UniProtKB/Swiss-Prot annotation:
A Pfam cross-reference name: Thymidylate_kin
Signal peptide: none
EC supergroup of this enzyme: transferase
InterPro entries associated with the record: P-loop_NTPase (IPR027417), Thymidylate_kin-like_dom (IPR039430), Thymidylate_kinase (IPR018094)
Taxonomic classification: Bacteria, Bacillati, Bacillota, Bacilli, Bacillales
EC number: 2.7.4.9
Name of the protein in question: Thymidylate kinase
Amino acid sequence: MSGMFITVEGPDGSGKSTQLQLLVENLKQKGYDIVVTREPGGTTVGNQIREVLLSPDHHEMTPRVEMMLYAASRAQNVEQVIRPALERGAIVLCDRFIDASIAYQGYGLQYDLDQIRSLNEWATNGLTPDLTFLFDLNPERASARMKDRGQLDRIESRDQAFHERVYAGFQTLLKQYPERIVRIDADQSIECIQDEVLDYTIERLQQGGVQK
């Protein structure tokens, strides 16, 4: 595959989705072939799974089922969207990927990390991002931002202890994969973050020889 696979991660409320859209716009203006997707979602099948996963009506969902639904959405996204785009040389920008499952289901719900990794290895046929931006925002600030947004989904509405475990999970991943995961201070202004993310992305694209 000759494209580049870039993911954004971070706690709910970190601003990662806003920054992803800004990065998409900036790269398109520079002439790059961009495909943008998200998880859960990104496909018709994935979007239906997303509705089930995030609906507050499904409070009885078990950690095992939650993990398997995320992996199912991810498998469809990889086969239908991500891998074909990479094979044609596009840059794929994805809002969350396997790191999110490790942080949210593994650390947040305290589900077995080895099982999560094994399931997702199979679901994606071993696909790993080339670059991941982790938007780092402490749980208290993230919680305040989420409350300002209004109604919360099933995941966002979990207690503060859950979100603190998720945050700790992301910090662990940052230490485990320093060559892939780049920490972004999400408490800066939108403009400062935008510039930092774009500069780093362009540098990595040039290093990787990705063509416009």
